[in-house]
């Protein structure tokens, strides 16, 4: 049907053209010649257009196009048919582009001067376009780049044009009578379009392109992922934390390193592409906010990655340490990675495989090995916690440094940390601005300003300015200050204000969670502890508890008072008889190590206890000195220092002497007088060295449950955090009936039996002959006594210097006398808790519970 209609239309159109030509006569001969030229050009373009027609006709219109092309070839020599074909070839182009159609209409009106032909062409073209669309543009329009680019603007037309470029050479060979110039014209057209093809084809691809990211992790591995081009910083950070199985992700961030010492934090609220210069998206995963107290972190895996960050800081020189601190931190690193020392597995030079310091020496490695060999049954998680507890005390812990100059042009360094803004000059801190004193922080061009709150004697606010290298550096410092102040000082983040017309200033706000919100979220974590691999040994993080207590060469491993607490889990012995006058003493020894000269590990001191009291509990720690007091009712506790460590566990000597005072048996009277003469000096030195009390890991455990009811079969308390304790128990029953009868020969006086029970819990310590032979030089000593109606508390503080190391020891004794039953667990817990609150940086190494009960027989 379509073929018949198209042929009839062509016949009518040819007759119409012939009649019109005869009417016009010779006056239109010039126009006819022009139309002949156009017809010849159109016929030359037929060969190039046939390939496209065949491809498009493959959709179901093949018969129509084949008949039409055959008809064109048969009537190509006819003048009227040439004009008809010219109008047909021009008109479909106007259906594709309205602008081209208007140009074609204007040319046809000028060249032929008739409206009837155009109307007829429109009526015929509508059917032809629906059935067999013809896209054969004029030759002069093919070379117009603007029109070609316009035709490439849609994605749907792209495949047809690519197919059209493949066939023109083969199709031009089929056409006969085609001029050479028209053939070259057809060849140039695909080349010009091929040059413009990459530009047009890239547009839709870029619109949906994903970006490849590389993130260097703290364990020296690289995490690669693909993110959407418009992804924000928080999207990438979340993916990295999911890869690492981290839930406490607010302490971490992604950084871009401008240089080896300068980094820029990726803003989590902005798109990544707006913050990254260049195509390669390479980031590093780092700790952004260093927690002031790492013990408050909920999960071990979070503390482990914090340890990895601090190790990088130490090796890179961003966290300077002394030799002793490097050795101590290095030993905890080895313990965390390798576990307990095993000579068969580790050999003699295993520490050299680890990078522990910027300038690692053989001497440092030997010291690390010596300390590592002294640790027994310390879990990786406990070693990480000990590492963090020592690292957080360093002056440069968690300080983000920025180079600047003061108003006089002197080079300084500004440090931002959790407590405030620090100012350093020549590697020394010269000023500190805590966050509570800072009212406002701002920047203008390359200057950075802080407004300080006036003091008590000041009446006006003061503004301090600093000069930074560039505007970008000033803005970066300002952002870091805003983030640290918001995270550590505020309970919630501020909402970003709505944009106002011509609003001045930056809209930047910290968009993450604050530390308070992070702790609340961490408290809701109820998943089991995740298993992860240590970087060096690839050893799964697991508990190393259960190993027998062994000797330590240099110092007792102390998991921050956890051992002492977990160790003191026993108070009640077998069968409690009737108590008439129970007396209980709790004695807590604590030791503090200070490093005035060359720092080294404090050597543990051992104390012999020669006791005579009714019922006592003694808790010594691994580096304690002596504090002793008269136990009450004419009974004294005598403390002796052993020359050699050959004490029998649980051995106690009881002496009845009403006038015997507590003294060190190995010290002369002159030394004792010196002790009492320097009490004021000791008090001053001790109070200066004690920091603010802060809650420790043990205090948290005390608040949740009481661990004083369980014991292992071998008498060792199952502690998860501390070294094993050696428990000894001694029960002595003395018969005082004979003495009473000799003094008071009365039949009414009952016979009294005294039962004494002593339970000792002590951290495992090694034999150190040198330390015991050299008692050290005693600097100061102080004794403080307080009494109530039912208890007496005695605290003795001594300070000695041994081998260039200052050592402070505190011993506390509590004696409770009463007729009622006493909750020994509660007394012990309270004594240890008070000791830790008063001296949070000391450790409890020994607990001795001494109980004496008088049994009357009627």
From Swiss-Prot:
Residues 1-125, 155-208, 518-636 are annotated as: Disordered. Residues 616-629 have a biased composition (Polar residues). The modification Phosphoserine is found at residues 14, 86-87, 97, 106, 123, 151, 153-154, 192, 522, 541, 543, 556, 658, 668, 678, 703, 706. InterPro entries: Band_4.1_C (IPR008379), Band_41_domain (IPR019749), EPB4.1_FERM_F1 (IPR021187), Ez/rad/moesin-like (IPR000798), FA (IPR014847), FERM/acyl-CoA-bd_prot_sf (IPR014352), FERM_2 (IPR035963), FERM_central (IPR019748). Residues 31-50, 78-89 have a biased composition (Low complexity). The modification Phosphotyrosine is found at residues 223, 654. It comes from the Eukaryota. SMART domains: B41, FA, FERM_C. One of its GO terms (molecular function) is calmodulin binding. The modification Phosphothreonine is found at residues 62, 379, 730, 853. CDD domains: FERM_B-lobe, FERM_C_4_1_family, FERM_F1_EPB41. Residues 710-858 are annotated as: C-terminal (CTD). Pfam families: 4_1_CTD, FA, FERM_C, FERM_M, FERM_N, SAB. One of its GO terms (cellular component) is actin cytoskeleton. Residues 211-492 form the FERM domain. Keywords: Actin-binding, Calmodulin-binding, Cell cycle, Cell division, Cytoplasm, Cytoskeleton, Glycoprotein, Mitosis, Nucleus, Phosphoprotein, Transport. O-glycosylated; contains N-acetylglucosamine side chains in the C-terminal domain. Residues 609-707 are annotated as: Spectrin--actin-binding. Residues 63-77, 103-119, 161-176, 185-200, 581-595, 606-615 have a biased composition (Basic and acidic residues). Protein 4.1 is a major structural element of the erythrocyte membrane skeleton. It plays a key role in regulating membrane physical properties of mechanical stability and deformability by stabilizing spectrin-actin interaction. Recruits DLG1 to membranes. Required for dynein-dynactin complex and NUMA1 recruitment at the mitotic cell cortex during anaphase. Binds with a high affinity to glycophorin and with lower affinity to band III protein. Associates with the nuclear mitotic apparatus. Binds calmodulin, CPAP and DLG1. Also found to associate with contractile apparatus and tight junctions. Interacts with NUMA1; this interaction is negatively regulated by CDK1 during metaphase and promotes anaphase-specific localization of NUMA1 in symmetrically dividing cells. Interacts with ATP2B1; regulates small intestinal calcium absorption through regulation of membrane expression of ATP2B1. PANTHER family: 4.1 G PROTEIN, PROTEIN 4.1. This is Protein 4.1. The gene is Epb41.
């Amino acid at each position: 049907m379509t073929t018949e209609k198209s042929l009839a239309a062509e016949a009518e159109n040819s007759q119409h053209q012939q009649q019109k030509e005869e009417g016009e006569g010779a006056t239109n001969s010039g126009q006819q010649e022009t139309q002949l030229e156009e017809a010849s050009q159109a016929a030359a373009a037929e060969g190039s257009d046939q390939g496209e027609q065949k491809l498009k006709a493959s959709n179901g219109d093949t018969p129509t196009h084949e008949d039409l092309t055959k008809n064109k070839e048969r009537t190509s020599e006819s003048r009227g048919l040439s004009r008809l074909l010219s109008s047909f070839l021009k008109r479909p182009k106007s259906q594709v582009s309205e602008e081209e159609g208007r140009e074609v209409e204007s040319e046809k009106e000028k060249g032929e001067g008739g409206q009837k032909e155009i109307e007829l062409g429109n009526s015929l073209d509508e059917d032809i376009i629906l059935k067999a669309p013809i896209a054969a543009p004029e030759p002069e329009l093919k070379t117009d780049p603007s029109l070609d680019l316009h035709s490439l603007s849609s994605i749907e037309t792209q495949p047809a044009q690519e197919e059209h470029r493949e066939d023109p050479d083969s199709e031009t060979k089929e056409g006969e009578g085609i001029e050479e110039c028209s053939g070259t014209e057809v060849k140039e057209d695909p080349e010009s379009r091929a040059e413009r093809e990459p530009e047009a084809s890239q547009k839709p691809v870029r619109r949906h392109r994903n970006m490849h990211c590389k993130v260097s992790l703290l364990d020296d591995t690289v995490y690669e992922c693909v993110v959407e081009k418009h992804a924000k910083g928080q999207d990438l950070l979340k993916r990295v934390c999911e890869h690492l199985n981290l839930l406490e992700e607010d302490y971490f961030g992604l950084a871009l390193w401008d240089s080896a010492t300068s980094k820029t934090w990726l803003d989590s609220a902005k798109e990544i592409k707006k913050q990254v210069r260049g195509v390669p998206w390479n980031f590093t995963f780092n700790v952004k906010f260093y927690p002031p107290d790492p013990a408050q972190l909920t999960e071990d895996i979070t503390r482990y990655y914090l340890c990895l960050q601090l190790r990088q800081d130490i090796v890179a020189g961003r966290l300077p340490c002394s030799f002793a601190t490097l050795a101590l931190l290095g030993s905890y690193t080895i313990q965390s990675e390798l576990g307990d020392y095993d000579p068969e597995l580790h050999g003699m030079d295993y520490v050299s495989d680890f990078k522990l310091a910027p300038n690692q020496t053989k001497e440092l490695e030997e010291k690390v090995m010596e300390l590592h060999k002294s640790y027994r049954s310390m879990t990786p998680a406990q070693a990480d916690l000990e590492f963090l507890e020592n690292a957080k005390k360093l002056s440069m812990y968690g300080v983000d440094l920025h180079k600047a100059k003061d108003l006089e042009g002197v080079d300084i360094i500004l440090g931002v940390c959790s407590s405030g803004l620090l100012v350093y000059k020549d590697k020394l801190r010269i000023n500190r601005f805590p966050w509570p004193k800072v009212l406002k922080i701002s920047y203008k061009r390359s200057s950075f300003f802080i407004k300080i709150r006036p003091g008590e004697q000041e009446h006006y606010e003061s503004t301090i300015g600093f000069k930074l290298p560039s505007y970008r550096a000033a803005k970066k410092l300002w952002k870091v200050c805003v983030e640290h102040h918001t995270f550590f000082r505020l309970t919630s983040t501020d909402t970003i204000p709505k944009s106002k017309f011509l609003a001045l200033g930056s809209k930047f706000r910290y968009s993450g969670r604050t530390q308070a919100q992070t702790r609340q979220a961490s408290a809701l974590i109820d998943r089991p502890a995740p298993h992860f691999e240590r970087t060096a040994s690839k050893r799964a993080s697991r508990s190393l508890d259960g190993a027998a207590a062994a000797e330590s060469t240099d110092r007792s491993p102390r998991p921050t008072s956890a051992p002492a607490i977990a160790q003191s889990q026993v108070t009640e012995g077998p069968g409690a008889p009737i108590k008439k006058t129970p007396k209980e003493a709790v004695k807590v020894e604590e030791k503090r190590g200070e490093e005035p000269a060359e720092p080294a590990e404090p050597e543990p001191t051992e104390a012999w206890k020669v006791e005579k009291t009714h019922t006592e509990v003694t808790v010594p720690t691994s580096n304690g000195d002596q504090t002793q007091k008269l136990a009450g009712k004419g009974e004294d506790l005598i403390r002796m220092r052993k020359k050699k460590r050959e004490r029998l566990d649980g051995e106690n000597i009881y002496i009845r002497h009403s006038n015997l005072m507590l003294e060190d048996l190995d010290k002369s009277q002159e030394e004792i007088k010196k002790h009492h003469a320097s009490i004021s000096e000791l008090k001053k030195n001790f109070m200066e060295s004690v920091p603010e009390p802060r809650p420790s890991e043990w205090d948290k455990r005390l608040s949740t449950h009481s661990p004083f009811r369980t014991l292992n079969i071998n008498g060792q308390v199952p502690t998860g955090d501390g070294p094993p304790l050696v428990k000894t128990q001694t029960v002595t029953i003395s018969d005082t009936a004979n003495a009473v009868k000799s003094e008071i020969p009365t039949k009414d006086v009952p016979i009294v039996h005294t039962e004494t029970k002593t339970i000792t819990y002590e951290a495992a310590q090694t034999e150190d002959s040198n330390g015991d032979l050299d008692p050290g030089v005693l600097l100061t000593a102080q004794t403080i006594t307080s009494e109530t109606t039912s208890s007496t508390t005695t605290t003795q503080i001594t300070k000695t210097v041994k081998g260039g190391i200052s050592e402070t020891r505190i011993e506390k004794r509590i004696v409770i006398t009463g007729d009622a039953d006493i909750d020994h667990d509660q007394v012990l817990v309270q004594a240890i808790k008070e000791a830790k609150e008063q001296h949070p940086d000391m450790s409890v190494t020994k607990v001795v519970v001494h109980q004496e009960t008088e049994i009357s027989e009627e």
